[in-house]
A protein has these predicted regions:
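An anionic, glycine-rich sequence signature occurring as long contiguous blocks
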Residues: 87-168
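Conserved, well-structured functional cores that handle cations and Mg-NTP chemistry
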Residues: 1-90
């Protein structure tokens, strides 16, 4: 209920779509199931795994790579991807995670492949390191780090990390 006492109804879902160049096609949508009582509603992870399995069953090979935010960085989701013939690129941003800390430590020691180049006024550095493991996940994983620097009213910096399931 809203603070006005009026009941609000809404739906939650997970969507799988083709991104990049047009057309942006929605391949499937999975509604998240509400729970009665005091229990929490079904989460995105459960719906996301169910959607992947349904799309695989319906379409066979429907994608090469699934790109997901940091919420999906866990062994059950990665296992679902791999078991359905998919690769994943998943945002790695929680600095408390061991895989993040291990990757940062190795990158600081200049481990892994590193490329550096300029794009306009931006200096871009990319690192790639393989051989990571995650509890409950039998697959070897990679971490890719992207760092961007540029000057504009002082120094600005942006850094991203992704966990990648493909080893190539």
């Amino acid at each position: 209920k809203k603070h006005t006492g009026e009941t609000e109804y809404f739906y939650r879902s997970v969507v799988c779509m083709i991104t990049g160049k047009s057309p942006h096609v929605i391949l499937g949508q999975e509604m998240l199931k509400p729970r009665d009582g005091s229990g929490k509603d079904e989460g995105e992870l459960t719906g996301g795994k169910r959607l992947i399995e349904r799309l695989k069953k319906r379409h066979g090979h429907f994608a090469d790579v699934i790109v997901a935010d940091a919420l999906y960085l866990n062994a059950p989701f990665i296992n679902t991807l791999k078991e359905n013939g998919l690769e994943g690129v998943i945002r790695l941003k929680d600095e408390r995670r061991m895989i993040f800390q291990d990757a940062e430590h190795l990158f600081k020691q200049d481990e892994g492949k590193k490329a550096s180049f300029w794009k306009g006024k931006k200096k871009i550095e990319v690192w790639d390191l393989s051989g990571f493991k995650m509890e409950g996940c039998p697959y070897k994983l990679r971490v890719v780090r992207y760092h961007e620097q540029w000057e504009e009213n002082g120094k600005e910096t942006e850094r991203f990390m992704w966990l990648v399931t493909t080893l190539e």
